[in-house]
Design a protein with these regions (language model features):
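Multi-pass alpha-helical membrane architecture of UbiA-family
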Residues: 1-286
Length: 286
């Protein structure tokens, strides 16, 4: 029974999607320890903080969006809609995640603790943005913009140019793939006055904006290599990333649910893994 409950909660918060969130923050950690001492405890605490913050964000998103989700054929089978998890339990998950997040921050400096409400505010406001702005995808990207600087601030009390560039690359990466994913709901969004770029600009223009966002992502990631003077392994990684982005956008030349899901889940998972590996090898070995 307990295992079934854990499985339901894991599905509710899409725990496996942490694969998208962790690499940018962990890459930031690797860049920081390139110039500072490595600490396994700090690494674990950062991972706990990231996962708990993301859990809060996903739970509160599901809670706030439950009325919209109940009408959307794509989302009406989610756990909160089908009563597999109650609203009370959903709020409890978000509350516990928030407590764990703040406990994990207590080992770091006061600056990151004082700035932490910004992270929570972005997570909390994001679900409402689709009700009033077509830039909702970029508001989601703010989470990834904040994460790398937050890691460095937690460890050093400041943040550097390369960390800011990493956060900015995460912003454009997430904004770009969220625009792609929103194509799945284009008809529903139009009928229900939900704001998204595909519903406003159409599929063709949205794909162009997504592609430009991902080109900027690659440029920013390459710029980190120059700033940090990273070696051959890093540039091989950049080349692979560029190839994966091309593959992702090649998949959505023909728009259908299967291709979009492949582009969103499979390709972005591969991009996340390659990103983390290239930073790990470049900072720890070279």
């Amino acid at each position: 029974m307990a295992l079934e409950k854990i499985k339901i909660i894991s599905n509710f918060i899409k725990f496996e999607h942490s694969l998208f969130a962790l690499p940018f923050a962990l890459s930031a950690y690797l860049l920081v320890v390139k110039h500072n001492q490595f600490s396994l405890l700090n690494l674990l605490l950062i991972m706990i903080a990231l996962i708990s913050a993301r859990t809060y964000g996903m739970a509160i998103n599901r809670i706030i969006d439950r009325n919209i989700d109940s009408k959307n054929p794509r989302t009406m089978h989610r756990e909160l809609i089908t009563k597999k998890i109650s609203a009370r339990d959903a709020y409890l998950v978000s509350f516990v995640a928030l407590i764990i997040f703040y406990i994990s921050l207590m080992s770091f400096n006061s600056i990151v603790f004082l700035l932490s409400p910004i992270v929570i505010a972005v997570f909390t406001i994001y679900p409402f943005t689709k009700r009033f702005t077509y830039m909702c995808h970029h508001f989601l990207g703010l989470v990834y913009l904040i994460a790398p600087p937050a890691v460095e601030i937690a460890l050093t009390g400041s943040f550097s140019l390369s960390i800011f560039l990493l956060g900015l690359s995460g912003f454009f990466w997430v904004s770009g793939f969220d625009i792609i994913y929103a194509i799945l709901d284009i008809e529903f969004d139009k009928k229900n006055n939900i704001f998204s770029m595909p519903s406003k600009l159409g599929i063709k223009q949205s794909k162009i904006i997504s592609w430009v966002s991902h080109l900027i992502t690659i440029i920013l990631i390459c710029s980190i290599g120059f700033v940090e003077n990273l070696g051959l392994i890093y540039w091989i990684g950049c080349t692979i990333l560029f190839g994966l982005f091309i593959r992702e956008h090649f998949l959505i030349l023909k728009i259908d649910k299967n291709n979009i899901n492949k582009a969103f889940f499979n390709m972005n998972a591969q991009i996340s893994i390659v990103l983390l590996i290239m930073f790990a090898l470049s900072t720890l070995i070279q």
